[in-house]
UniProtKB/Swiss-Prot annotation:
PANTHER family with a match to the protein in the record: PHOTOSYSTEM II REACTION CENTER PROTEIN H (PTHR34469:SF4)
PTM statement from Swiss-Prot or TrEMBL: Phosphorylation is a light-dependent reaction catalyzed by a membrane-bound kinase; phosphorylation occurs on Thr residue(s) in the N-terminus of the protein.
SUPFAM superfamilies assigned: Photosystem II 10 kDa phosphoprotein PsbH
Entry keywords, A to Z: Chloroplast, Membrane, Phosphoprotein, Photosynthesis, Photosystem II, Plastid, Thylakoid, Transmembrane, Transmembrane helix
Main location, first listed in the record: plastid
Cellular component GO terms held in the UniProt record: chloroplast thylakoid membrane; photosystem II
Similarity field: Belongs to the PsbH family.
Stated name of the protein: Photosystem II reaction center protein H
Membrane-protein topology: Single-pass membrane protein
Species, as recorded: Nymphaea alba
GO BP terms, alphabetized: photosynthesis; protein stabilization
């Protein structure tokens, strides 16, 4: 048998900690979904702004567009 229980073993339930007690209310909404689109448009805007940010960083790194007229030395 792969698993075996030992008779008379004292195994208590999960330990209660201060951090666990503080974080418990945050997990009380688990599984509940807000009706409609919720914050999806906000996430879309955030993703678009992040894509613009990454493209600006890439352009600076490649010295392709933003730094054409600037000498670095």
């Amino acid at each position: 048998m792969a698993t075996q229980t030992i008779e008379g073993s004292s195994r208590s339930g999960p330990r209660r900690t201060i951090v666990g007690d503080l974080l418990k209310p945050l997990n009380s909404e688990y599984g509940k979904v807000a009706p409609g689109w919720g914050t999806t448009p906000l996430m879309g805007v955030a993703m678009a702004l992040f894509a613009v940010f990454l493209s600006i960083i890439l352009e600076i790194y490649n010295s392709s567009v933003l730094l054409d007229g600037i000498s670095l030395s």
